[in-house]
Each structure stands twice: as C-alpha cells, then as structure tokens.
Amino acid sequence: RSSSAASDVYKRQVQYLWEELKKNDDIYLSKYSGWYSVSDEAFYNEDEIEDLDNKKVAISSKSPVEWVDEESYFFRLSKWEKALLEFYEKNPDFISPASRKNEVISFVKSGLKDLSVSRKSFSWGIKVPNDDDHVIYVWLDALTNYISALNYPNKDDELFKKFWPASVHIIGKDILRFHAIYWPAFLLAAKITPPKKVYGHGWILSNEEKMSKSKGNILDPLEIIKQYGLDPLRYYLIKEVSFGNDGNISQERLEDCINSDLANNFGNLCQRVSAFVIKNCDSKVPEKIKFENDDIKILDEYSQNLDKLRSEIDNQNINYYIDYIVNRLFEANKYFNDQEPWKKKDDKIRSVSYTHLRAHETRY
C-alpha cells in the first residue's frame, strides 16, 4: 500500500472513530474559551497556568499558552467520570507506577470537564466528518494510531483480535493524562476494550535538570553509543534509572558503571570461566557433572527466583532484575576466590564441576 493510500485509510479510520463517538451522543458542538499550548498540543485550565517572564505558561511544561476563543466540538468527558473510576477500581494494575495511578485518580475525582476535540483555526489535520471548517484534535487523531495499525474498525480482523487490547502502553509521564484518562474514555464510549496497562515512565535528567539546548546539558545518545557501545548504554540506563521515576545520568557515572559492573564484575567472571573451560574442558562447557552441596544450593537459589524475576520484568521493575544479577555476579566472583580452584591441580573433577557451575552463572 502506498503512503498516500495508507494516509487516506488512516484518515477514514480516525473519522470512523469520531462518527462512533458522535453517534453515541458523546460529541457535541459548542464554544471553547480557554488556554491552549501549541507546542504541548494541550488545553489547560486556569489553575494549570502561571506567569513566567511576563508570559503565560503551563506550570507542568513551562510552554507558552495562548487564549483561544472559538467554536469547537466537545467530547463529553464529564459523562465518563464515574465509568473511569469504576474501570480503575476493577483494573487496579491499569496505571503504573502507583504514584502515577494516585495522580490520575485524584485528577478524575476532582471533576472532569468536557474536552475540546476540534480546532477551527488550524488548516492542517484530519477534517471533522461533514464539517470541513473543523479539524480533529491532534490527540484524538494520534491515539487512534494504536488501533489503526490493527485494521480498525474491523474488530474481527486477525490482527485486531491478536493484539488488542494491548498488553501495555509505555509512555512519558507528561502525556499520562492523554493515555490514562482521555484514551480509555474514548475507547469506552466507542465500545472498545481499553489497553491492559498504561505505564508512565519518568524523565532522564542531566545534572539533576531536564535536558534542554538552552541549558547546554544535552547528552547526545548517538555520540555516547559511538564511544561506549549501545548495550553498555542500555545497561546503564536500566540500572541507573528506576523505571517510573526521573533518573539523573552523567558521562562520569556511565564510565563508572561500565568499569565496575561490566568490566570488573561480569567481565572478570567471564574471563576466569573461559580460562578454566579452555584449560580443563577442551574449550567446551561440560554437560554432565556431579555437583557438591554448595554448588546445588547456588543453582537451586537461582531456579527458585526465576518466576519472581520474570514477574518483576512483567511489572516493569527491570532495575530490580539488574540489581539481582549484579549481586549474583559479585557472589560468583567471591565464591571463585574462596574456592581457589587454581590450587586444585590434583582434583580435576572438582575443577571441572566448578567451571561448569560458573559457566552457568555467566549465562544466567
């Protein structure tokens, strides 16, 4: 399908969702008067605005806002306040982490106002069906992407049945409201099951501040990858930033992490194990070895924790998993020193079994 054809299909999908909402009396025409941020593509209430350098800005993003006074279509968000709270209660894991969940529920309980879902002053965008003077609000348009790729509105399509509802939307905390309030409200109104979970991750900070060109504190990931490699950067971010919270990073801490965890801890263990495998096992990890009680305890402990570790990953607690692995590697190096296998020249079997155990640890 050509890009122009795909674009036409997508427009029809967005317009179909619009018509479904309108058919159910969830969209009506009225007049909007209030603050709007072009850069945030978001509407703000009066209590979400402040004065900064003689300008009106959004408190959350510091982006400039302008007063808008124009005809607009509205989505009856207030109508879905009770349904949303019931949905959150029936699906307690829908919003994570807990701090974000509390934030969203508190906002909904404070009272939802109907949401402006069209702009009359914009020339670009998808036209409102049967009203070319209006274009559909960008977030109603953009959120439809999640289901348009699954051939919505055909809910019997194999892609739609296989992948919807989505297991998780992982999004930035600054757009949590769109995904955890507006999106499920749109879907419930259109009789579509919302995703199973929305996870609002934090920001990556540099020197305790949000990165910006004006502050000159941006760390270019492409340059870092050139210097240190992609996997070390991934590892550092996962370990350093507790998922769901803001995380402060620096090049110095990246280097310390690579040296301590990947080189001195993991790398050292790999080098030691490889040397023993080459020397005692013809460069192959042995398959059948008789372990001693201390070895069996270690392997049993690993096996018993696998389900918990998988659960932590499923719940986006990836840094917990990383911490567990780092601690096990540290213990493996300590066990290596305590056992002193290099002194067991006359105990070939013990040397080989020890090598087998350590090799399993590096693969784990």
For each predicted feature, which ranges?
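Conserved, charged catalytic cores of large soluble enzymes
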Residues: 4-112, 152-159, 270-309, 329-347
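Acidic, serine/threonine- and proline-rich low-complexity regulatory regions
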Residues: 307-323, 339-354
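Short, charged/polar, low-complexity loop and linker segments
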Residues: 246-251, 304-310
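An amphipathic alpha-helical micro-motif enriched in hydrophobic residues
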Residues: 328, 348-358, 363
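Single conserved hydrophobic/aromatic residue that forms the stacking wall/gate
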Residues: 1-6, 10, 356-364
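C-terminal amphipathic alpha-helical
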Residues: 270, 313-323, 332, 357-358, ...
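Structured secondary-structure scaffolds
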Residues: 12-13, 60-279, 321-327
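Single, functionally critical "micro-switch" positions that shape active/binding sites
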Residues: 6, 24, 140, 178, ...
